[in-house]
């Protein structure tokens, strides 16, 4: 079974369920009860019905309507930047490092939207953002 790790667990649940939905044909999906399929999928991985996924199969349609579909992934992109920036503090050996905190404030926060956000991030990190810190935070890096 998958242990709870907060929000990271939520993403794992959704990913596992998504993989199960994509492992069947459209014809098979039309014959299924979506709620029952979801319940059986989550049980297969040792996940309880009482701990609901963030979005249930039957009401996640909002991502496919209007302009929200591309905007939804901006949350994931923000999480990439967040985890990578926090990784700088872990690399410094002190998440309360005053010098690094000042650099973050000076290179990103104080600039606001006066410069391109990715340029600001590169100014802080010295490179473009990478996804590895996010994968680690969400338990998707294969280390556990």
Regions found by a protein language model. Give the residues of each.
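Long hydrophobic segments that form regular secondary structure
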Residues: 17-44, 48
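Active/binding-pocket-proximal capping segment
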Residues: 31-41, 54-58, 79-83, 91-105
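A generic secondary-structure signal for well-formed alpha-helical elements
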Residues: 21-24, 45-49, 80, 84-93, ...
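Single conserved hydrophobic/aromatic residue that forms the stacking wall/gate
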Residues: 1-11
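Hydrophobic alpha-helix position signal
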Residues: 2, 41-42, 89, 122, ...
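Hydrophobic alpha-helical scaffolding
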Residues: 4-5, 27-31, 50, 67-71, ...
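C-terminal amphipathic alpha-helical interaction region
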Residues: 94-142
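C-terminal substrate/ligand-recognition segments
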Residues: 9-24, 48, 53, 60-87, ...
């Amino acid at each position: 079974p998958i242990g709870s790790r907060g929000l990271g667990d939520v993403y794992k649940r959704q990913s596992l369920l998504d993989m199960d939905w994509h492992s069947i044909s459209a014809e098979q999906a039309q014959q299924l009860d979506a709620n029952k399929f979801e319940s059986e999928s989550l049980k297969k991985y040792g996940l309880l019905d009482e701990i609901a996924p963030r979005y249930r199969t039957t009401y996640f349609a909002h991502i496919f309507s209007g302009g929200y579909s591309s905007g939804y992934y901006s949350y994931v992109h923000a999480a990439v930047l967040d985890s990578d920036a926090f990784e700088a503090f872990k690399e410094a050996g002190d998440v309360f490092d005053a010098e690094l905190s000042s650099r973050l404030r000076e290179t990103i926060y104080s600039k606001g939207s006066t410069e391109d956000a990715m340029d600001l991030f590169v100014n802080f990190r010295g490179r473009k953002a990478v996804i590895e810190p996010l994968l680690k935070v969400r338990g998707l890096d294969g280390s556990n």
